[in-house]
Amino acid sequence: TETWTPRFFYYGSRYLQVETSGHDAGVALQIVELTSKFVHSSAETVGTFTCANPLVNRIHELIDTAIKSNWQSVLTDCPHRERLGWLEEYHLNGPSLRYEFDLAQLFAKGMADMADGQLANGLVPDIAPEYTVFKDGFRDSPEWGSAYVLVPWQQYQWTGDLELIRRRYDGMKRYVGYLGSRATDHIVSHG
């Protein structure tokens, strides 16, 4: 009997194909059981949704599972490809996700990643942590980097907690200053 579980890797999929190797030729390897594990962040459920329509309830359940499959240590936009922490997920999806989940810890961690990735000139790259350094619009897009300003504000709006704003205020000002340095007549038009 052999049991194996990856410790540092996850992959989203609908189907899984298993091939075996390394056993004696002509001897069939018997696979007794394969079990997949659904892993995601431990954000606490704080709200629920149900209605009288079973189809709508099932759709909500599928969406809820899809959302959770994109929560590891960062919010990703898909669990089956690069799994990078694209920042727009925080501020565009954050408000709707907060109806069902307590995202304070996950978002505080995301803000720490953004702070760690902020450049000396104030730029907040489009992904955090920045494992891959992209160029141009895939690294410097205001609609992604603005998560650094919007997420603390949303946290305050939802919880009344000013801690993220206090902790990240200087970096937020640096990012807004960076955007100002790229603006023409006070209009940001790049990205």
What are these regions (language model features)?
Residues 16-21, 88-118, 149-165, 172:
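Alpha-helical support elements that line or immediately flank enzyme active sites
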Residues 178:
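Structured mid-domain segments that build the active-site/substrate or prosthetic-cofactor binding neighborhood
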Residues 186-191:
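Flexible glycine/proline-rich, aromatic-decorated loop/lid segments
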Residues 1-80, 88-89, 105-108, 121, ...:
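Extracellular/oxidizing-compartment recognition motifs
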